[in-house]
Structure formats: C-alpha cells, structure tokens
Swiss-Prot record:
<feature type="binding site">
    <location>
        <position position="868"/>
    </location>
    <ligand>
        <name>Ca(2+) 3</name>
    </ligand>
</feature>
<feature type="binding site">
    <location>
        <position position="1023"/>
    </location>
    <ligand>
        <name>Ca(2+) 6</name>
    </ligand>
</feature>
<feature type="region of interest" description="S3b collagen-binding domain">
    <location>
        <begin position="992"/>
        <end position="1104"/>
    </location>
</feature>
<feature type="active site">
    <location>
        <position position="503"/>
    </location>
</feature>
<keyword id="KW-0865">Zymogen</keyword>
<feature type="binding site">
    <location>
        <position position="897"/>
    </location>
    <ligand>
        <name>Ca(2+) 4</name>
    </ligand>
</feature>
<comment type="function">
    <text>Clostridial collagenases are among the most efficient degraders of eukaryotic collagen known; saprophytes use collagen as a carbon source while pathogens additionally digest collagen to aid in host colonization. Has both tripeptidylcarboxypeptidase on Gly-X-Y and endopeptidase activities; the endopeptidase cuts within the triple helix region of collagen while tripeptidylcarboxypeptidase successively digests the exposed ends, thus clostridial collagenases can digest large sections of collagen.</text>
</comment>
<feature type="signal peptide">
    <location>
        <begin position="1"/>
        <end position="39"/>
    </location>
</feature>
<dbReference type="GO" id="GO:0008270">
    <property type="term" value="F:zinc ion binding"/>
</dbReference>
<dbReference type="Pfam" id="PF04151">
    <property type="entry name" value="PPC"/>
</dbReference>
<dbReference type="InterPro" id="IPR041379">
    <property type="entry name" value="ColG_subdomain"/>
</dbReference>
<keyword id="KW-0964">Secreted</keyword>
<dbReference type="InterPro" id="IPR007280">
    <property type="entry name" value="Peptidase_C_arc/bac"/>
</dbReference>
<keyword id="KW-0106">Calcium</keyword>
<feature type="binding site">
    <location>
        <position position="841"/>
    </location>
    <ligand>
        <name>Ca(2+) 2</name>
    </ligand>
</feature>
<comment type="similarity">
    <text>Belongs to the peptidase M9B family. Collagenase subfamily.</text>
</comment>
<feature type="propeptide">
    <location>
        <begin position="40"/>
        <end position="86"/>
    </location>
</feature>
Amino acid sequence: MKKNLKRGELTKLKLVERWSATFTLAAFILFNSSFKVLAADKKVENSNNGQITREINADQISKTELNNEVATDNNRPLGPSIAPSRARNNKIYTFDELNRMNYSDLVELIKTISYENVPDLFNFNDGSYTFFSNRDRVQAIIYGLEDSGRTYTADDDKGIPTLVEFLRAGYYLGFYNKQLSYLNTPQLKNECLPAMKAIQYNSNFRLGTKAQDGVVEALGRLIGNASADPEVINNCIYVLSDFKDNIDKYGSNYSKGNAVFNLMKGIDYYTNSVIYNTKGYDAKNTEFYNRIDPYMERLESLCTIGDKLNNDNAWLVNNALYYTGRMGKFREDPSISQRALERAMKEYPYLSYQYIEAANDLDLNFGGKNSSGNDIDFNKIKADAREKYLPKTYTFDDGKFVVKAGDKVTEEKIKRLYWASKEVKAQFMRVVQNDKALEEGNPDDILTVVIYNSPEEYKLNRIINGFSTDNGGIYIENIGTFFTYERTPEESIYTLEELFRHEFTHYLQGRYVVPGMWGQGEFYQEGVLTWYEEGTAEFFAGSTRTDGIKPRKSVTQGLAYDRNNRMSLYGVLHAKYGSWDFYNYGFALSNYMYNNNMGMFNKMTNYIKNNDVSGYKDYIASMSSDYGLNDKYQDYMDSLLNNIDNLDVPLVSDEYVNGHEAKDINEITNDIKEVSNIKDLSSNVEKSQFFTTYDMRGTYVGGRSQGEENDWKDMNSKLNDILKELSKKSWNGYKTVTAYFVNHKVDGNGNYVYDVVFHGMNTDTNTDVHVNKEPKAVIKSDSSVIVEEEINFDGTESKDEDGEIKAYEWDFGDGEKSNEAKATHKYNKTGEYEVKLTVTDNNGGINTESKKIKVVEDKPVEVINESEPNNDFEKANQIAKSNMLVKGTLSEEDYSDKYYFDVAKKGNVKITLNNLNSVGITWTLYKEGDLNNYVLYATGNDGTVLKGEKTLEPGRYYLSVYTYDNQSGTYTVNVKGNLKNEVKETAKDAIKEVENNNDFDKAMKVDSNSKIVGTLSNDDLKDIYSIDIQNPSDLNIVVENLDNIKMNWLLYSADDLSNYVDYANADGNKLSNTCKLNPGKYYLCVYQFENSGTGNYIVNLQNK
C-alpha cells in the first residue's frame, strides 16, 4: 500500500510519535495541512520586499509562531514572524543577569533593548524557569506594559514591542513546559487586558510614525498569544478605518500594512481558538458572538477597495477576504460576511486572485453557497482558473511527459526543459545504475509538469490545486506532478531550468531509487534520507550532456570559506529540514563522492534501492565518525571555492532548439555503431508535440574488468568520448544525443559489459506516421455514494481502434485526480460532482467522457468526547460502535490519545481523522499482542483529513493518535467496520439497571455486594442506586466507563441529599474509591456531563 505524500524540501515531517526528534521550521507558518514542499527558491522566499503573503494556516499563529521563531541555529527569530529589532545596544543578557535585577530596573531595561539581546528568551532552561516562575516578576512586566501603554508617544514606543515579546516568550514556555503551565491559563493571560486597553486609549494609538506602527503590530501579536475581549477587538476599528481611508498612501508602506495584518491575524487566531475550547465548538457560545460587529464591518470593508487595488495592497485585501470568511460566524447574521465575499466576487474580475480567494472562502466557511442559498459552483471556478492560468498543454514521449503551462511561458523554454530532463536522466542513470521503475503502475508512469507564468500566478495553485506555494516548486509524488513557475533574475537566483533539474531529480529518486511513496517505510521514520534527497538533487542539477556532472556556481557560492562556519560531515549526514545550509553542503558531499569516491556513492545508493535501512544507517554512522573523511570533504570544499571563478551553471545548449535537417534513422543507427562499437542495437521511436525522438539500446563490451568501481569510471569516460566523437559528425542532430549505461556484468572472457542507451532527435521523414483515430473514454461507476465512502471508477472499457490506451486521467470534480485505469475515490463534502475521464492513446490522441456523481451525507451514529487520561494503551478509550465520532484534543503535555475497538469478523475497516486545526497530528493502528509494530497508518492526507483502511482479522485493535510538532489541536476520529461492543468478562454475571432511576425517590435498590450494567445518554443523564449498610463498612465502589463518555459518580447519605459523602478517583476509564461508612442508607449517583453521548458502564460494589 502506497502512501500519498510528496517528496519535498522545506517542510518534510516525519510521521513519528511526539517524543521523536521534533521538526522545526525556519520560516513563519510555512505550510498548509501537513504538505511538504521542495526546492523552495531561496531568493523568492525573500523577494517580497517586506510584503507578507497570505498565511495559509492561520490557525497556527500563536504557540507555533513562537516555536518557529526560535528554530534557527542561533536561536533567534527570522522574518516577519517576530517583532522588529530595536537594536539600541549590542549587549547580550543572560537570564542569570536578569534574575538578579529588581523588578523596576528589569522593566526599565526591557524597554530599552530588543528580544535579540536575550538569545535564550524562548528557550526553556534553569534561567528561564527561574525568571518566568516568579509570578510577581511576570506581573511587573504586565504592569510595565500597562504603564508604557499610557505613556508612549508618537516618537517613543516606551519599549512596548519588547515587553510584548517577553510576555509572548512566557506564554510559549508555559504552553510547552508543565513547570510553567500557570502562564498558559486564561486567568493570567486576561491580566493583559488592562494593558491592551491602556495602549488603545492612548491618543497615539493609530498608524503614523514607525513607533506608532510598531505599537499597533505588537498589540496584534499580544492578542494572538494572550487574550482579547469584545472591547479590545472593537477598539481596533480606528486602525482598520484609517488604513482603508488612506490606502493610496499606506498600501505601499510595509510597517503600516504589517501592523494591520498582525491585528487581523491575532484577532482571528484568538477568537477561533476560543471556539475550540467552547462547548459544541459553536461561536454562539463565546463572548464575541454578536458583540464585535463594529470590527467585522471594518474588516469586511477592506475586502472591496475598488480601483484602488494594486500590487502593493493586494496581499492585505487577500487577507481581509480570508479572515472575513473565518470570522463571519461571530455575527448574529453571518450572511453579512457572506455578502461581503459576494461583493468581492462582483467587484473583482472573474478569476482574479481576489475573486478566487473570495470564492474559496465562501466554499470553506459557507458551504460553497451565496447568501441566497445558491451554489457558487466552486469546482467550476477552479476548473476555469486552471484553463485561464494554464491554457497550454504540451506532450512528449508518447504522452509520458506532459507540460501544462501559462501562456507567457515560451515554447522554446518548454523544449529546453524537456531536453534538460534528458541530460539529468542520463547522468542520474549512470550513477544509480537502474533504469527500471521500482514499482510499475504508480502515478509517476506519466510525469506532469505545471508551470505558471509568474510567482504571483503561482500563488493561485494553493487554491485551485490545493498545494502549498511558499516555495520555488513542489513535486507531488502521489499524483506524479510537479508545480512551479517562470521567474525573472530579479525574482530568483535560480533559473527555471535549474529549479526544474532539481525537481526532476526528485521524480527520478522516487521512481528509480527510493522504494514506495515519499514518507512510506522505515527510511522516513527518522529522516535519514533528508540530506541524500536534497543534496543529490542539487548535485544532479549540474548534469551535462558530455562532461558528466559539474558543480554549480550558484550553489557553491553558498559554502562558507571559513571551515569553522561550515557543516561537518556528521552534520550533513544527520541534517533535518529547518535551514537551507544542508542543501549546499549535501551538494558538496555528493560532488566529493562523485569525483573522489564513487564506491561510497554507489554503496549508500544500493542500500536505499534495496530498502536496507539498517545497512544504510550503519554505513552513515561509520562515515560520520570518520574524521579523516571529514577532512577530505572539507579539503574538497576548499578546492571548489578556490576555483569558483571558473565554475558556471550547466544549462542545455542552443543546439537542442535549433533546426535539424532530415536524416534517415538507419544512418543514425550506423553512425552510433561506428563510433561506439555497440552490439545488438535496437531502437524505439517516441513522438512528441514538436519532434520525434529515439531510444537506442545495445551492449558494450569493454576491456578486462578491474572491479565494478573502476569499470564504471572507464565506461563513464568512454561514453563521454563516444558522444563527443559523434558530435563531430556533420549532422547537428547528434548534439542532442544523451546516453547512459546500466547493468554491469563480466563476460566469460573477463571483460566488463554494460547495457548502453542513447536518446536523441529523430528527423527521419520516412518514419511511419499515420492519421490517428481518437480513442473513446468509457466510465463505469455507481451514480451516487455516501460522503467519505469509497466509490470505484473503472475506465478499462475505454477503447482505441488503431492502437492502445496509454494513459488515464480522472478528474473527480473536487480538485482530486488519478492516473489509474481503475480508480477509487472518496468525497469529503456532499453535493453533485462531474467526474471526467480523459484517455490518451499511444499516438497522443485524447478523448474525454463525463458523468454526474451524487454524494449524500452519512451522519455518525453517535458523537462522544475522549476521556482523559488515555495516553497509554492500558488506559485506552473504547470505540464501541461503527461510525461513532470521537472528539479529542492534543497538546505538548497531552501528546498522545489511545483508543481501542473490537473487530467482530474479518472485513474492511476505515479510519478517518479530521485535523480541525491543521496542526501536526497523525495516527497509527496496532493489533493486540504486538503494540510495537503498526498494522495501518494514515495513507491518505489532504492536509486536514487523515485516512486509512485495511481488511482486518477479528480481534482487538489499538488506535494511537499523536502530535509530532508540539502544537495544540483538536480532532475528530471515526472508525467504520464490523465492530462489536464487547461486554467484559467481569460484567457477564452483572444485573441490568432498571429505569426510571433518575431521582433519589426512584433509586434502584442494589445489594452492597453486586455488579450492575447501566447506560447513560443525552436523554438519560444520571442513574441512582440505593444501598443499605448494616454495619460499619469499607464499601469499595468501582465504576468502569465502557464507552469513553464523560461520566463520574458521587455517594450521598440519605440523611443529607445536598452534600455528597464521597466521590470517585479517576484512573483512565476506571472511577473508584473505598468509602468508610456507618450503618444507614446511601445513594450512589452515576452521572454524565457535557452531553457526551450514549455509553455503557459497570458498577462493582464490594462491602469489606
């Protein structure tokens, strides 16, 4: 079973339990859903000239933001995710120094410094614990903030930004460290409200000077990390109005735009986080409901600014649209916000970014409907957007290589990328020694390359295709598709071709070297391939046609001249995502091995191809501890830097795109034989949109074998010479020929033997070409399906009269696609979808058929909440029924929830986890008796929904839901299958409770030594039992919660029904206590709270 993840760069996350090495990010709120990106363009990442693009995952701006800020090597924040540096002095302060200061001096000092003056500010250690565990000290900072709030001026911010950062550091440390958990309480955070209001009621609270803008920004950050009330939120309207009224002047001012953005972001995060801690997750149950309309009016007004929209302010309008959609639920009449989004769709041009953003927000927050209840048909909007922004399609290699591009991406550029792929592939195959796909039938049988016109248009890919755009390009392995964009030198230090070469290498890695999909298997559990995948991708991007693989100047210049500032060999081999450095140093290591130790390169590559994880780890460990090898690696980098002026960036030559005269294919074959002495040469012709190409494969017999590594070097050199000799011939088409060799053997004479493959331009006009008849697509499937249920689509009855079907492309109408002949799909939302099947024949002919599919709702049979503690298998909550929805929450302290269910008979079991906050959550499933090896994990991931299914044998299974990135999040989990609610052995001789026993005067009488099976529900919240005690006794009461509902028990004396005499001690699902009782009548009240659904329990009474 393959895992639907993507191979990537900046943000690959390991699906491991929380206690594994935690991944951190160097950029602020970098990704959506748990998607991973690759080959992020270093210059593009910082090319916005201070502008902040829309943050896709706005739910992560609080503790996550702080975590990201301290993720860099020097423990200092990066980018716009932290307050601007004050830089008033360069002195570094330790917590030991700060802890020795009195409160007054401390606060005054904080006002004069930057967060950068305290490098350990966000680190938990003895000093920070001592500092923040002192409640009076924290209170002094809050009072200091309030005082500064009253006294700051237009020219002096009185240290407000740094005071805020100190408080944010405390909240961060309190969230992730239980020793400081008091800082994470609403009570303490609410103590900031007077300070916030002091800031707002200061007459200087507005946009204006740099100091004023900084104060507004700091307030937004504080709101997001601390607290707010309707008054604080509504007090922000003047800032939003001022920005709107002066948008011509303020739109291009970074500090003002950033200040407004942080206000919107902080308010959105805090108010939505309150919902997740509110009964029923309902905005109506919060203090903000129907009380922040003034703020909403100003926010909504920023959604439509008419002809004042320009490149400087568009990003802020995009954010206003996004936050309007998310916060409309706080209005008594949400349709007001809904209409604001509708107005945006009417005001902005069809398929402009703002139009699509507004439509997306209606789809996400209002069920895809306008205020009149009509469907906006967002799927059609996305389809039209793809048609507008990607109107061109180019096919190569009989349809196995497809490019979809913007209208400004030139045909010449497309052709160059195709030929660049051949140069990279040829050198890649030489090194890895494999040209057969590890698994046939994967989506990457057809590679699709999507190229937008520009970075701006590329941002739409997040909406219309659902993938992160905070990168220079992204390869999604489970759909065999690579997304990127054309760029100018001002926008990127890399050309499109350079980036394409890097990404194309990831495609080759996934198809020919690394077994399974990205993220699947043991290789990915600890991130041991991180350096290999990214370092060799940078390396192979330097592939040439005839001169092997060259070190690229654009990457070499990123190496440090001072060895003390470089990554060591150990550091490279154990690199994790979070910084850019290991790309450069992994590139240098790959170049070192290629030029000085191919045996080492081959050995680690073979471990990967053979899926030998332990062998690979052992080999990496031995390399890491080899100090002599590290010295050679460092020496090699010295040589690269000393020669940097002579380096360049390999790109394809103009010969590929120049015209080529016609030449008989037989002449080409004979010429290749002549210069190479290749035997048994066979050829295969493939058609592309602009030209025809050939692959010729034959056998080369070399000299006496000197061992595989030496044979490889000899063959590599000889093949380069063969290509150069061929290029000397008069026909210029030979300058398009690339070649590789694989399958080393030694013949009976002791000579080495390789299979050699040539690829080049075929201009033979006599090559058989006929008029192709279009194939016919045929769809076989059901016409309706339940939401989240699997539906099967069969395209195998599609036909082609004069050939065969070579490719299938399903478009399921919800943005998802498949390239399989027989596909399965699940819809996440109800509605009617138009499914399209496009088939391509062996001659490039295309035909499309469509069919309507109706998706209907499937409501869970019951909704319950998890019962803590359930962090261990022995304390697991039971999931008693199929299609029961369980609500749970994870955090730094509560990082794992365990559940169990019993499978009654062999059959398919489906598990669906909805990640409500888009944080780092996943799940694994274990069989009772082997809790160390999982039997199933989340194989489907669209960013918020983690799915998996498998045919399971009867028995008990344990489900582990856990967080892997130190973020708090709420989730729901649903299990469907043949489940049974197994009554435990201890309950088989129990009596059944008899209703109605909901009041003391209707209590069910039971013996003081008895077992009772009872049931609670939302309509039956309590059961009462009467017990007569004849003698002084120790009554042991154990109530076992069978179905994980929220329940408890209290014991009352008949003499006082207002005050209980004893209560339960909770231990997982067991509620127990031993009560010392005098003779008399007692009432045991077993009750449910929070309306957590229907559940069974067992009462066990033992009178000692």
